[in-house]
Structures are given as structure tokens and as C-alpha cells.
């Protein structure tokens, strides 16, 4: 599909400096000054209203803002290959419906190659979405400038170009909305190797999206020598998810302090990390645990917290010997 949209050709339409739309008094002045014949004036008003309607409904600033927010969210999502029998719809897969034997039938080398194809397809799709959204922004700016022209005559003279531009922008919007949903992966080669008399199942590959894992910045807090971390996923999966939590001390000052780091598997959305150094900055990252079907994960959330200062020297026992020990406990909250 060609997403190129031709320009409006505003260079052929002379625009004066922008000003506000004609109000009722200015309309009467325009008619009194005989800028246009009455019928031509009515045509101008009808066409300008149609253009205004398009810009306030199909291409409104609020709608474009929502699309930009969705685009930013897609850049943070994780993308997976879903293997489905042809009679199942995307989202129906679970251990009961999709037996693990399906993976046992698939050639591992071919599947790894398809994961690379899936990653490339996802990257291209995100780039195309960004390009389409940029075209929508630019198109709205062009049409806004045309509406602000104080002289109706060039507007009427260039109406054919305006109509073409409206059709082009509608097509761009349709393409953008269609591409927001990950599509099917096209298989050039059989994924299932020859297994003799065994009946080969009919399968298809789809790209699916999982919402990003993000820290709860209000609930994640640092104490003197420990932190309480919380995170969430906007849309919870039907099956409980596993996460990978990483932490490290920023700007360690000794070799022993370099041991203040770790990778922790977590089966919940909350965790406490203890035996940290007081009055120091730590960086934390969270993501889903590695999955065999993951093809692209461009982003992971990170959070920096600063532990509170400890008591004055001499009032607390020495922490020597504890620097390399990083006891971690799941949160009870």
C-alpha cells in the first residue's frame, strides 16, 4: 500500500496574513463590498463550513493528541509471536486451548528466523505509523492556514485541490487506524518439519502486543536502607505474569559498593529490596521475564530513588560486612 499523500498545492493559492474567521458583520461587509456574487458567496460559506466540520470532527486537535498518545504507548509495548490453530482468534490462546505440543512440532531454527521477521515487521510498522501521523499533522496545518485566508476567491479557485486533500487525509487516517493493530506474519516456508505419518496441524502466526510494565511512582518509595517498589500493567493478562527486576547503586565509591546490584525474578507487582546504603541513589528497572515468543521490546521503565540519610556516626552499628549482601523480600502490601 502506498501511503504517500500529494501536497495540497498551496503555492498555487495566494494566502494573505492569517486572521480570525469572518463574523456576521464581516460577512455583511463582504456582501456590501461585492467581493463575490451572492451565489458564489453562498458556495464559499458552504465549502468553508464543510472544511471546518472535517477539521473539528475527522481531524480535530483532540483526536490527533489521542493518536500521538497511543503512538507513544506503542513505542513502549512488547511484541510477541502468537502461534494459533487456524480456527482460533487472537486472544483465545491459553495452555488449555493451545497445547505445548504445538511448539514441539515447530522447527526451532525456522521459528527463530520468523522471530527476526516479526521484529523487522514491527519496527517497519512503527516507522510507518509515525510517518502517517506526521502527514496528518501537516495536513491539518495546511487546511488551517487555508481557512484563515481573508480572501474567499483563492479558496474557491483551489477547491478541487482541497477536495483531493480531504480524500487523501481520510485515506491516511484509515491506514493509520488499520496499522494500530499488529497484523499477521506471512510464512514463506513451512515451520513444521516433516513428521512422517503424524498429521501436520494448520497454524498461523500473528503479532500480538502487551502493554508496557511501568513503575507506580507514587507508591514506590525509598527508606533509609531499603526500598518498596510497585509496578503495574494497564491491561492485566489472563495468566499471571513473571517479571524481572534489576537494581544497581549509582556512582559506587569502592569495589565493595559495586556489588550493590542484582537481578530478581518476581511473580508479583510489588517487591521490597533491603540492605541498601543510606543516603545513596539507586536505579531500578522492571520488565517482563524473557519469553520464547518475544520478538521486540524497545523500552523498559526505569526509576531512580534516593535512600534517606542514616543516623549520625556513632549512634548506629557499623554496616561493614553488609555492603555486598543484598537481601530481598517480596512485599506484603
Curated annotation (Swiss-Prot):
Q: Where is this region: Disordered?
A: 307-333
Q: What InterPro entries has UniProt attached to this entry?
A: DUF5581_C, DUF5581_N, FN3_dom, FN3_sf, FNDC11
The Fibronectin type-III domain, residue ranges: 212-310
List, alphabetically, the SUPFAM superfamilies matched. Fibronectin type III (SSF49265)
Name by which UniProt lists this protein: Fibronectin type III domain-containing protein 11
Q: Which organism is it from?
A: Bos taurus (Bovine)
Amino acid at each position: 500500500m502506498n501511503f504517500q499523500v500529494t501536497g495540497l498545492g498551496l503555492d498555487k493559492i495566494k494566502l494573505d496574513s492569517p486572521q480570525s474567521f469572518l463574523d456576521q458583520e464581516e460577512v455583511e461587509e463582504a456582501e456590501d463590498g461585492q467581493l463575490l456574487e451572492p451565489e458564489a458567496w453562498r458556495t464559499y460559506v458552504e465549502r468553508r463550513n464543510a472544511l471546518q466540520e472535517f477539521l473539528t470532527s475527522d481531524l480535530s486537535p483532540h483526536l490527533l493528541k489521542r493518536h500521538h498518545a497511543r503512538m507513544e504507548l506503542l513505542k513502549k509495548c512488547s511484541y510477541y509471536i502468537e502461534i494459533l490453530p487456524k480456527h482460533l482468534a487472537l486472544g483465545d490462546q491459553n495452555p488449555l486451548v493451545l497445547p505445548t505440543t504445538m511448539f514441539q512440532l515447530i522447527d526451532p531454527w525456522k521459528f527463530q528466523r520468523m522471530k527476526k521477521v516479526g521484529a523487522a515487521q514491527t519496527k517497519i510498522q512503527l516507522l510507518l505509523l509515525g510517518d502517517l501521523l506526521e502527514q496528518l499533522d501537516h495536513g491539518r496545518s495546511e487546511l488551517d492556514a487555508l481557512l484563515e485566508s481573508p480572501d474567499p476567491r483563492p479558496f474557491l479557485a483551489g477547491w478541487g485541490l482541497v477536495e483531493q486533500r480531504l480524500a487523501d487525509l481520510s485515506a491516511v487516517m484509515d491506514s493509520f487506524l488499520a496499522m494500530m493493530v499488529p497484523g499477521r506474519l506471512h510464512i514463506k516456508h513451512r515451520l513444521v518439519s516433516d513428521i512422517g505419518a503424524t498429521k501436520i496441524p494448520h497454524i498461523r502466526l500473528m503479532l500480538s502486543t502487551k502493554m508496557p510494565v511501568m513503575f507506580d511512582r507514587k507508591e514506590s518509595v525509598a527508606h533509609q536502607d531499603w526500598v518498596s517498589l510497585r509496578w503495574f500493567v494497564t491491561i492485566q493478562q489472563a495468566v499471571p505474569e513473571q517479571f524481572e527486576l534489576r537494581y544497581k547503586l549509582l556512582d559506587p565509591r569502592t569495589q565493595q559498593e559495586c556489588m550493590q546490584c542484582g537481578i530478581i525474578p518476581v511473580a508479583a507487582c510489588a517487591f521490597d529490596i533491603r540492605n541498601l546504603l543510606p543516603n545513596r541513589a539507586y536505579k531500578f528497572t522492571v520488565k517482563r521475564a524473557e519469553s520464547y515468543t518475544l520478538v521486540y521490546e524497545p523500552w523498559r521503565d526505569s526509576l531512580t530513588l534516593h535512600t534517606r540519610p542514616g543516623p549520625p556516626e556513632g549512634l548506629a552499628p557499623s554496616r561493614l560486612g553488609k555492603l555486598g549482601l543484598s537481601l530481598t523480600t517480596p512485599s506484603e502490601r
